[in-house]
């Protein structure tokens, strides 16, 4: 993997990631394909509206269907028929979300499979080995997702464990002679000194890119923005900056303005299935009775398949009846909206007009929910 920084507009960055499998223009948004599938979408549909890279989850794939099943096809790309790059999450977040069913030690985490209750152990080495077998183009280190809220002593202890695991992840990645990219993950909760310490240690270890973890875990928007105000500048300018698990369209705009290059989030797909649709003027809750006889299109500014062919009334009907087509049409629109938003931001940075873009974006987003 190679990253080229092409242009900056204040702190906002316009770049390109070059993989053997193709190029990814940044800032970039990755739809989440947890089990090797972006829900309701074919790979061809994803590509058609600008998706360049997707995210898979090594924890879930290792349990279902199992790494042996994926390897029987070749790798994860072959298994799901996706021709572009794939980033895989290490599984750290998922393991720690199991709560009382898992036990953390210096070596790693013991837990029971959410599938059948079987005992499983996962540490940095196991996670890196799984991601190598999946053929991930970007491998993530295994870390502890710091709980929120937590006192500073707890956050510090968690961060130090993650840093030791980061070194072990790097050592295993090198031992396997994996030529694909490996990203570190900055932790440290809401504490600036700990975040800066985490970033500095990861830079010293040496990674191909750096992710910011431990955000969008329950903190306020103000707390998240405060971290983004100082943290990106602590990371090397020639390396990718990835904000994990974020977020709303407004979150993406704020983060790009502060120097973030990559994002992933389940929001556009999950919200689509629940009838929350992102538009140029705000969120449309398509189940609302007001749309029963509304024959207008969802978003007059959108050129997606859904907006070119169907009315709000029809989408309302599909959502009320829980029709599979409704989930598909909603997902097509939300993902198209996200990818078009990223395209607009890339163009704004290229033309040194990001501030103008941001002002117009907020002027249009006049309502949170319609």
UniProtKB/Swiss-Prot annotation:
UniProt GO cellular component terms: cytosol
InterPro entries in alphabetical order: ArchSynthase1/Queuine_TRR, TGT, TGT-like_sf, tRNA_ribo_trans-like
Pathway membership: tRNA modification; tRNA-queuosine biosynthesis
Transmembrane regions listed in the UniProt entry: none
Cofactor: Zn(2+)
Catalytic activity: 7-aminomethyl-7-carbaguanine + guanosine(34) in tRNA = 7-aminomethyl-7-carbaguanosine(34) in tRNA + guanine
Pfam families per record: TGT (PF01702)
Key words, A-Z: Glycosyltransferase, Metal-binding, Queuosine biosynthesis, Transferase, tRNA processing, Zinc
GO MF annotations, alphabetized: metal ion binding; tRNA-guanosine(34) queuine transglycosylase activity
Bound cofactor: record note: Binds 1 zinc ion per subunit.
Positions that bind Zn(2+): 302, 304, 307, 333
Example GO BP: queuosine biosynthetic process
Region entry RNA binding, spans: 245-251, 269-273
Domain of life assignment: Bacteria
Residues reported to bind substrate: 89-93, 143, 187, 214
Active site: 89, 264
Subunit organization: Homodimer. Within each dimer, one monomer is responsible for RNA recognition and catalysis, while the other monomer binds to the replacement base PreQ1.
Primary role: Catalyzes the base-exchange of a guanine (G) residue with the queuine precursor 7-aminomethyl-7-deazaguanine (PreQ1) at position 34 (anticodon wobble position) in tRNAs with GU(N) anticodons (tRNA-Asp, -Asn, -His and -Tyr). Catalysis occurs through a double-displacement mechanism. The nucleophile active site attacks the C1' of nucleotide 34 to detach the guanine base from the RNA, forming a covalent enzyme-RNA intermediate. The proton acceptor active site deprotonates the incoming PreQ1, allowing a nucleophilic attack on the C1' of the ribose to form the product.
Family statement: Belongs to the queuine tRNA-ribosyltransferase family.
Protein name from the UniProt record: Queuine tRNA-ribosyltransferase
């Amino acid at each position: 993997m190679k990253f080229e920084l092409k242009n900056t507009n204040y702190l906002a960055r316009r770049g390109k990631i070059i993989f053997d499998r193709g190029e990814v223009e940044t800032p970039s948004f990755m739809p989440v394909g947890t089990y090797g599938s972006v829900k309701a979408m074919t790979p061809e549909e994803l590509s058609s509206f600008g998706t360049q890279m997707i995210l898979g989850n090594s924890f879930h794939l290792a349990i279902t269907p199992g790494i042996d099943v994926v390897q029987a096809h070749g790798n994860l790309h072959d298994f799901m028929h996706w021709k572009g790059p794939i980033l895989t999450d290490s599984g750290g977040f998922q393991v720690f979300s199991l709560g009382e069913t898992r036990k953390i030690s210096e070596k790693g985490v013991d837990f029971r499979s959410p599938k059948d209750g079987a005992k499983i152990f996962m540490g940095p080495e196991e996670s890196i080995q799984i991601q190598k077998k999946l053929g991930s183009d970007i491998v993530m280190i295994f870390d502890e997702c710091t709980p929120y809220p937590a006192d500073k002593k707890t956050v510090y202890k968690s961060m130090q464990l993650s840093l030791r695991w980061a070194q072990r992840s790097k050592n295993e990645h090198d031992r396997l002679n994996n030529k694909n990219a490996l990203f570190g993950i900055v932790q440290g909760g809401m504490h600036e000194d700990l975040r800066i310490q985490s970033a500095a240690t990861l830079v010293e270890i040496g990674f191909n890119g750096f992710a910011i973890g431990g955000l969008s875990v329950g903190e306020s928007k103000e707390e998240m923005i405060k971290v983004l105000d100082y943290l990106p500048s602590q990371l090397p300018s020639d390396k990718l900056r990835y904000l994990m698990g974020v977020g709303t369209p407004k979150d993406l705009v704020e983060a790009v303005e502060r120097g973030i290059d990559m994002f992933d989030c389940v929001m556009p797909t999950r919200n689509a299935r629940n009838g929350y649709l992102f538009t140029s003027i705000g969120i449309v809750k398509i189940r609302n009775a007001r749309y029963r006889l509304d024959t207008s299109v969802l978003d007059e500014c959108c050129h997606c398949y859904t907006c070119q062919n169907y009315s709000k009334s029809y989408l309302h009907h599909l959502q009320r009846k829980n029709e599979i087509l409704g989930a598909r049409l909603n997902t097509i629109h939300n993902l198209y909206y996200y990818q078009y938003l990223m395209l607009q931001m890339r163009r704004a940075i290229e033309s040194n007009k990001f501030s103008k873009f941001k002002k117009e974006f907020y002027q249009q987003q006049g309502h949170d929910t319609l």
